[in-house]
């Protein structure tokens, strides 16, 4: 029996989002850059892993730079983005590098805000490592 040919529906037209929000989540192991519209709907993202790094190299500033560049270039080309507000979360080494990479890629940064969660004496932290 011949296979039925599946027809695709109409392709979604790309919407233009001139202003967005870049969320940079920087941990010691990885840096994830997510670019959203002002409502919070994800448009594009990049991380140390999607930039081609594995293991401990994902946490490096260079991996964060490449991840931010990838996300920014896609946001500019596909969504016509020009301006971003940057929300930085976490203590990782890729924080500043990712912000610089967004600026170098051609996005105008209008606001940088640190939204790292700080406990008001919440859960007990893990024990100190003895190396």
UniProtKB/Swiss-Prot annotation:
Keywords of this entry: Ribonucleoprotein, Ribosomal protein, RNA-binding, rRNA-binding
Biological-process GO terms, alphabetical: translation
Residue ranges the record marks as coiled coil: none
InterPro entries cross-referenced by the UniProt entry: Ribosomal_uS11, Ribosomal_uS11_bac-type, Ribosomal_uS11_CS, Ribosomal_uS11_sf
GO cellular component: a single term: ribonucleoprotein complex
Family: Belongs to the universal ribosomal protein uS11 family.
UniProt subunit comment: Part of the 30S ribosomal subunit. Interacts with proteins S7 and S18. Binds to IF-3.
Protein name per its UniProtKB record: Small ribosomal subunit protein uS11
Organism: Dictyoglomus thermophilum (strain ATCC 35947 / DSM 3960 / H-6-12)
């Amino acid at each position: 029996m011949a296979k039925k040919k599946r027809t695709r529906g109409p392709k979604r037209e790309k919407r233009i989002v001139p202003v967005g929000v870049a969320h940079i989540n920087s941990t010691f192991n990885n840096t994830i850059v997510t670019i959203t519209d002002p409502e919070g709907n994800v448009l594009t993202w990049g991380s140390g892993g999607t930039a081609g790094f594995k293991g401990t190299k994902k946490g490096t500033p260079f991996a964060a730079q490449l991840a931010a560049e990838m996300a920014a270039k896609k946001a500019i080309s596909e969504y016509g983005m020009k301006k971003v507000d940057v929300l930085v979360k976490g203590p990782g080494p890729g924080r500043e590098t990712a912000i610089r990479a967004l600026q170098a890629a051609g996005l105008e940064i209008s606001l940088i805000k640190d939204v790292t969660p700080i406990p008001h004496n919440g859960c007990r932290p893990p024990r100190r490592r003895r190396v």
